[in-house]
């Protein structure tokens, strides 16, 4: 179902941790590396060592810092939290401290609502400090 209006929902406190493997196209300028034998992490350009087979692997920034990669969002129904998906593309502050944002109300846009009740391509548009999470009803999706 196509969504034409924004939704007010909240962060549930659930999140997914960042993946390890860096899949970018520019490892020669990348700053986050891990020694594959010892697990030691480096925040400096180690491309030369990587290129010459020194056992280093580029890792994602989120993995380096132990951040969340996406946070779960939800709505309320009959006093219970109903998860409606995960949001990525969040600020470093939010990803670094996901539990600090539990129950914070946000305005979200999305391409559509899937058949199983999840948002597809959700995007955070901003915080709604004027609302309590209990006001974020599943009824918005009908």
What are the functions of these language-model segments?
Residues 1-111, 122-128:
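Nucleic-acid 5′ end/cap handling module spanning
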């Amino acid at each position: 179902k196509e969504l034409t209006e924004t939704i007010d929902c909240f962060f549930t406190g659930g999140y997914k941790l960042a993946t390890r493997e860096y899949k970018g196209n520019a490892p020669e300028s990348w700053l986050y590396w891990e020694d594959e034998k010892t697990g030691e992490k480096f925040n400096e350009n180690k491309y030369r060592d990587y290129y010459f087979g020194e056992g280093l692997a580029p890792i994602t920034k989120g993995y380096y810092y132990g951040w969340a990669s996406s946070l779960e969002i939800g709505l309320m129904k009959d006093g219970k939290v109903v998860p409606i998906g995960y949001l990525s593309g969040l600020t470093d502050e939010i990803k670094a401290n996901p539990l600090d944002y539990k129950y914070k109300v946000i305005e979200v846009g999305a391409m559509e609502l899937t058949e199983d009740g999840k948002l597809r391509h959700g995007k955070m548009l901003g915080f709604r400090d004027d609302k309590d999470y209990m006001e974020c009803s599943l009824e918005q999706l009908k």
